[in-house]
Regions:
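A glycine-/small-polar-enriched, mobile loop at the entrance of the PLP active site in fold-type I
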Residues: 15-53
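Flexible, glycine/charged-enriched surface loops at secondary-structure junctions
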Residues: 45-50, 64-65, 250, 294-303, ...
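Conserved C-terminal alpha-helix-loop-beta "cap" of PLP-dependent enzymes
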Residues: 3, 311-390
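Conserved PLP-enzyme active-site core in the AAT-like
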Residues: 1-26, 53-67, 71-280, 284-292, ...
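Short glycine-centered, acidic/aromatic-flanked micro-motifs in structured strand/loop junctions
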Residues: 39, 160-162, 342, 376
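Alpha-helical metal-binding/catalytic segments enriched in His/Glu/Asp
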Residues: 35, 225-226, 374
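Alpha-helix C-capping/helix-to-loop hinge sites
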Residues: 38-41, 291-294, 357
Length: 403
């Protein structure tokens, strides 16, 4: 009996990838052991975050960094740092911004439900541009001049959501931001791998970039990384850490917080609810070390071999109602995936039955395009045969019943 079953929940198989709703990646033994070890000892949390800042900064090339409660919390704290700076009175006001300089410019095609992270800190998002290719109205997408045209006395910063095909280029946005002395915040939550992206955005001159620690890095699911300019990371720390201290004898590590630049300790800030435990910080740092040191290309080749087992089993059904395709990205650091396609059966119902009856959670992103996806992140030599066998049997039974 698993720990989940002991308390009334099922253990499932996450074939959806990094999705938070199904728990994200399974932790490696190395990461899990690090978290257990950390749980057995106390630590000054400011010192731990300062040490984490040093380690992460060496990897990312940033001035400083902070371990956050996921990428979304990182975005909230990025906005909070820009809005409040190192001013304790402004930190106390958030999410109210009395100066009204709280607008962040974002492309309409970068908008998503995750924008709430910025608004949570008191930011107002200002949409610009459009994607006429997507709407079928033309050949143009959001262009740099549209960002610049939206800048006014209330503009606090620019938001850039990074994907493989984000437009405009990050270089063009940084150029405009620097011209107007505005910070750029990059949402790169899911932009790993490739590992080069750990340094890419900082090298391009952005001020803050947020990554998920619980996706490809395979750290604790509720962890994240925010890295960038020290003045902003210092503000994040001041608004996140337990500030129940006497200023006279408070000696924060200078690489994280320069005491000489603040006049008083703020009260508990907007980030206090985004507390990150010592165990999560330790797990994230070990996971990051493993991520940058491992032979990721060999891992992707192994992932493809595991998908080929599932692919072979499904194809052995010899059914004309279903087809499969393994998709291999051009970047050798990215996961291959297996698409299960059908024009003839109800894939919505199939996916629902796989979840309900078998505890198999596939990626449903392509359901409206008539395919389900198997992501191999949580496949292993130990579970592949059982998963493949159950998936094959369930699809066979589903087709047999005429669904």
């Amino acid at each position: 009996m698993s720990i989940y079953e002991e308390f009334g929940a099922r253990s499932i198989y996450n074939l959806a990838g990094t999705s938070t709703r199904v728990g994200g990646p399974v932790l490696s033994e190395e990461v899990a052991n690090a978290m257990v070890e950390a749980s057995q000892h106390s630590v000054d949390m400011t010192e731990l975050q300062a040490s984490a800042s040093d380690y992460i900064s060496k990897i990312t090339g940033s001035e400083a960094a902070y371990v956050t409660a996921g990428a979304s919390a990182g975005l909230t704290m990025a906005a909070a740092a820009i809005l409040a700076g190192l001013d304790p009175s402004k930190m106390e006001e958030l999410p109210t911004v009395k100066s009204q300089k709280n607008q962040f410019i974002i492309s309409r095609e970068h908008r998503s439900g995750y924008d709430h992270a910025f608004r949570l800190a008191g930011a107002e998002t200002i949409d610009v541009g459009m994607n006429e290719i997507l709407s079928g109205a033309g050949v143009r997408r959001t262009e740099p001049w549209e960002y610049e045209a939206a800048i006014n006395e209330r503009t606090a910063g620019i938001i850039y959501v990074a994907t493989e095909n984000s437009e405009p280029s990050i270089e063009s946005i940084v150029e405009i931001a620097k011209k107007h002395e505005l910070p750029v915040v990059v949402d790169a939550a899911a932009q790993l791998p490739p590992r080069d992206n750990l340094r890419y955005f900082i090298e391009k001159g952005v001020d803050l970039v947020a990554y998920s620690g619980g996706k490809a890095i395979k750290g604790p699911q509720s962890s994240g990384i925010l890295c960038g300019k020290k003045k902003y990371i210092s503000s994040v720390a001041l608004q996140s850490l337990d500030m129940d201290e006497f200023f006279e004898i408070w000696n924060p590590p200078s690489n994280l917080i320069d005491k000489s630049k603040i006049t008083a300790i703020p009260r508990h800030g907007i980030g206090r609810g985004f507390k990150v435990a010592k165990e999560e910080i330790a797990g994230l740092l070990v996971a990051l070390r493993v991520f940058i040191e491992k032979d990721i290309e060999s891992e992707m080749k192994q992932a493809k071999k595991l998908l080929e087992i599932i692919n072979k089993d499904i194809q052995s059904l010899n059914s004309d109602k279903i087809s499969t395709l393994i998709k291999s990205p051009s970047n050798k650091e990215q996961y291959p995936t297996l698409n299960i396609h059908s024009e003839n059966i109800n894939l919505f119902e199939l996916s629902n039955q796989l979840k309900t009856n078998d505890g198999l959670f596939l990626n449903e992103t392509g359901l409206n395009q008539k395919f389900l996806t198997v992501h191999p992140m949580n496949l292993s030599n130990e579970n592949i045969n059982k998963i493949s066998s159950v998936l094959k049997a369930s699809i066979k039974e589903f087709i047999k019943n005429g669904n």
